[in-house]
Amino acid sequence: MSKPIYNRILLKLSGEALQGDEGFGIDPSILDRMALEIKELVEMGVEVGVVLGGGNLFRGAKLAKAGMNRVVGDHMGMLATVMNGLAMRDALHRAEVNAKLMSAFQLNGICDTYNWSEAIKMLREKRVVIFSAGTGSPFFTTDSAGCLRGIEIEADVVLKATKVEGVYDKDPSKFNDAKLYNTLTYAEVIDQELKVMDLAAFTLARDHNMPIRVFNMGKPGALREVVMGTTEGTTIS
């Protein structure tokens, strides 16, 4: 039987991935499916860290344009990721997966504060670790948090789950002839200004040689396919 090509992964899930067709909030059926897909990886022996976005509940940048202080908006966005983290932890527990939720800032009584050595210890014990509250600082996206935590926990790859099959040369929702890339280099992404993630997050990954794999989490079984080394999605290295 073939083995996973990654021992430890950082899975970056957008908040929008959790909302399904609802347009807002959390779709319980999608949450449960994701929990079962993560469980499958754990049973294969893969160590899983998860970073969640919060865009399904709140977007700080959007309100900042309407006049809200950006720092306040970003703090609210960070709390939205904690709410998503609580939901994901609950879904994993219901799927009988041992999971720990950590926040970048103190939330006593709700979840643990992020601790690097503790996170590594839990991953080695095959517990899923969910990292919430972004980086804990405003002006940084959850993609930056995903790359940062991936580098810190020495993950083999950052898996960015999206609503499309991977990275295209142009927007596939607008252009029928958009070409899907199988592999790209960091330089190609920057030269062609391809939308993978924000530049701060992307350059952080590049500077630490952290491979990024973009794939469609909406496709059942895609996460397993990626971890098993199929050509699913786009690999950037």
Swiss-Prot record:
Pathway: Pyrimidine metabolism; CTP biosynthesis via de novo pathway; UDP from UMP (UMPK route): step 1/1
Top EC category: transferase
Superkingdom per UniProt: Bacteria
UniProt note on regulation of activity: Allosterically activated by GTP. Inhibited by UTP.
Name used for this protein in its record: Uridylate kinase
Cysteines paired by S-S bonds: none
GO biological process assignments: 'de novo' CTP biosynthetic process; UDP biosynthetic process
Main localization, broad class: cytoplasm
Positions annotated to bind ATP: 12-15, 55, 59, 162, 168, 171
Pfam families found in the cross-reference section: AA_kinase
Lineage of source species: Bacteria, Pseudomonadati, Pseudomonadota, Gammaproteobacteria, Pasteurellales
Gene Ontology CC: cytosol
Region annotation (Involved in allosteric activation by GTP) ranges: 20-25
Subunit text: Homohexamer.
Keywords: Allosteric enzyme, ATP-binding, Cytoplasm, Kinase, Nucleotide-binding, Pyrimidine biosynthesis, Transferase
UniProt-recorded Gene Ontology molecular function terms: ATP binding; UMP kinase activity
UniProt binding sites for UMP: 54, 74, 135-142
SUPFAM superfamilies attached to this UniProt entry: Carbamate kinase-like (SSF53633)
Function: Catalyzes the reversible phosphorylation of UMP to UDP.
UniProt-listed CDD domains: AAK_UMPK-PyrH-Ec
HAMAP family noted in UniProt: PyrH_B
Catalytic activity annotation: UMP + ATP = UDP + ADP
EC number, as in UniProt: 2.7.4.22
